[in-house]
Amino acid sequence: MRDKTGPKFGPYQPDDEAVSPSRRRLILGMGMVSGALVLGGAKTAQAADCRSPDVAGTQDERWQKQPFYGQHQAGVLTPQQAAMMLVAFDVLATDKTSLIRLFKLLTERLAFLTTGGRAPSVNAKLPPLDSGIMGPEIYPDNLTVTVSVGNALFDERFGLQGQKPLRLQRMTRFPNDSLDAGLCHGDVMLQICANTNETVIHALRDIIKHTPDLLSVRWKREGFISAHAARSKGQETPINLLGFKDGTANPKISNKPLINNVVWVSNNAGEPAWAVGGSYQVVRIIRFKVEFWDRTPLQEQQTIFGRDKNSGAPLGMQHEHDEPNYAKDPEGKVIPMDAHIRLANPRTIETQRNLMLRRGYSYSLGVSNSGQLDMGLLFVCYQSDLAQAFLTVQERLNGEALEEYVKPIGGGYFFTLPGVADANHYLAQSLLEA
């Protein structure tokens, strides 16, 4: 029998237990909004059925949508959208019951936001139920919100210690890292992607509005790829802010057996049963020293990466997706031994187990206190085994020539939850009911 506090039964009344006086006042204020939500529940449910009669048959990108329900979450294999945001949260829930309430509420909101519909109206004397930044109609706009959990969620707070994924750990410092504690880790990570920044921001504000007693933002970063790359639906490799294609060597999404092996946790992985269908997510905020890089000779840039800057082809080859044959270049005369692509993937039988799926975005934040441009890469990758993939590859990359131009400053390791089967289930259900 379904728990009637779940997503099928509308919004939740916040719990006063273990809440500070200031937060209690905030929650009481939210109670007015919750009441309006309950009164308008039927209308809200109807609005969730996203209809677009005025644009039927057109190519209006605002009506593009990704499926919310399925074996795996969207946003991992989904072709990269143009806009992206990474948001790490601390969980304010104090027990397992309230944690379940959080994930049911997240499921409800994400199912609505990724489907779209008309924003419900309320009495003008009450806070509006929607920010309004998308207008009266909430378009799906190709939105995906991928939910992952961090190592800290498996501490003693919720009794989940015995259910932690085997390879999940707190991100530690590599030799070239200069980690800012305020940009690291988190209990919950949301990767929010859509066609436009407005949709990404709207989704974040909706989630924060509905979870004031359950989540607190720890850090966030916004990213982008070119509109051309996004519209290509994965056929055009994005170019990073160093001017090189980023993600050329990704495994092909169309190769399902390979993707199942590289990305998704399987039944025979020895992981907790609930984790099957999930994936290890690595997030790294990597700042680029672009002024220094822009004064570096082209030949040196290309030997650092091991690729032609224009075509993306491995040095000595013609096309981006040509595979380098290192056996024919044993001394690194064509592609240097310490080139980024050669260290990251030596292309031996043994190193095929180290593959991962990258899904990175560029970021630009203005200038530093010293007047230098603050921009770089939001590196995101997914793999079925954190130790075998990212950690092993990063160990090979330690000391590479590229380190002179890049500086990792934040991020974390997370576990991307399996998908939600249907409307009768919720995110993290197999974990929380294990």
UniProtKB/Swiss-Prot annotation:
The GO biological-process annotations, alphabetized, read as:
iron import into cell
Q: Which reaction does it catalyse?
A: heme b + 2 H(+) = protoporphyrin IX + Fe(2+)
Query: What Enzyme Commission number(s) appear in the record?
Result: 4.98.1.1, 1.11.1.-
Where heme b is bound, by residue? G247, T248, A249, H340, N345, P346, R347, R358
Cofactor descriptive note: Binds 1 heme b (iron(II)-protoporphyrin IX) group non-covalently per subunit.
What GO terms are given for molecular function?
A: ferrochelatase activity; heme binding; metal ion binding; peroxidase activity
Main localization (coarse)? periplasm
The entry describes its oligomerization and partners as: Homodimer. Part of a ferrous iron transporter composed of EfeU, EfeO and EfeB.
UniProt xrefs under PANTHER family: DEFERROCHELATASE, DEFERROCHELATASE/PEROXIDASE
Can you say what this protein is called?
Deferrochelatase
